[in-house]
């Protein structure tokens, strides 16, 4: 249809130009000739273009159609991790070309990125996968495990730590063994302190009586009564005994804490009692009191000093404290008073009191008023207890036996309630 239209248009223009030219010939021959040439050239060009397009369409319709490219086939291979990747076809739409690298392959749409699979060599099992060891790199030297010193440092550190632990353990054991006796003594003292104080007087009394029995053994070997007879006579006026005797019975105890020992244990006499017994034996060698007194006045003086110190320590123990420096006890004249002096002890009447056989044992307590001047009730208690012990030693009903007549007869005394008590 286009060709027909073009031909018709060309004919129409040609006819128009011919008519125009004829008209111009009449008016002006030159101008019309030029205009007609231009129209002819334009029509010729258009007709040539139309004829060229028609020839191309005929050629295209006559040529056979081109074939589509076949999809590529990617071969199976071992990747960089040693895993086997199976083969696959690239037939999904436009992704028909096998692209990528030898270790990683995929499908793509660009032909220019196609992979040349014939150049890859990872189609067989690698050697390092068979031996289980990675291949040695060319730039690394051969590794010699015998020259590796890293394990030696670990061994040295562990050895030093083990030695330090052993030294600490043995040091601790040595210190515990060195301090064990002190701990035993401290625990024993604490256990004695924490015991009930109600049994202290009875235990002290029984221990003191056991020691007195030993003294009587050295003084008189003839008569002796059981120690149980003395329990009923001295239970009411029992006071804490001398801490010197406690220290002789227990060398590791503390005098101010009132240590307690087993009342049934027989305590051996201490150094002072042995000295007293030896001096007593020297003083009573001939059996006569007068003769022995004339022969050994020094022995009697030592005995009197011993009993004086003993009673003084008993009074201080009853108050609960001991002097930090030695106190000299001076002798004073003896007092004459009725034999039965009433004295109250803790609100109770004491029993019959007599003068003990040792006059120097009951001296005035005015020298100790610096410790506790208002402690009059304790002083009365000490005097009452001393008189009681003197009665037990000299009376005929003494449970420990009759004392030998080595001392003058007891002298009466009495105690007043005055704070400034003077003995005449």
UniProtKB/Swiss-Prot annotation:
Alphabetically ordered keywords of this record: Cell membrane, Cell projection, Glycoprotein, Membrane, Postsynaptic cell membrane, Signal, Synapse, Transmembrane, Transmembrane helix
Topology of the protein relative to the lipid bilayer: Single-pass type I membrane protein
Topology feature Cytoplasmic, residues: 171-424
Transmembrane segment boundaries: 150-170
Protein location: Cell projection, Dendritic spine membrane; Synapse
Glycosylation site residues: 45, 89, 116
UniProt gene name: SHISA9
Molecular-function annotations in GO: PDZ domain binding
Database matches in InterPro entries: Shisa (IPR026910), Shisa_N (IPR053891)
High-level lineage: Eukaryota, Metazoa, Chordata, Craniata, Vertebrata
Residues in the signal sequence: 1-23
Domain of life: Eukaryota
Pfam families referenced in this protein's UniProt entry, alphabetically: Shisa_N (PF13908)
Protein name: Protein shisa-9
Source species of the chain: Homo sapiens (Human)
Assembly notes: Component of some AMPA receptors (ionotropic glutamate receptors) complex, at least composed of some AMPA receptor (GRIA1, GRIA2 and/or GRIA3), CACNG2 and SHISA9, as well as low level of DLG4.
Main location: membrane
GO cellular component, one term: dendritic spine membrane
Chain segments carrying region Disordered: 333-424
Ranges facing Extracellular side: 24-149
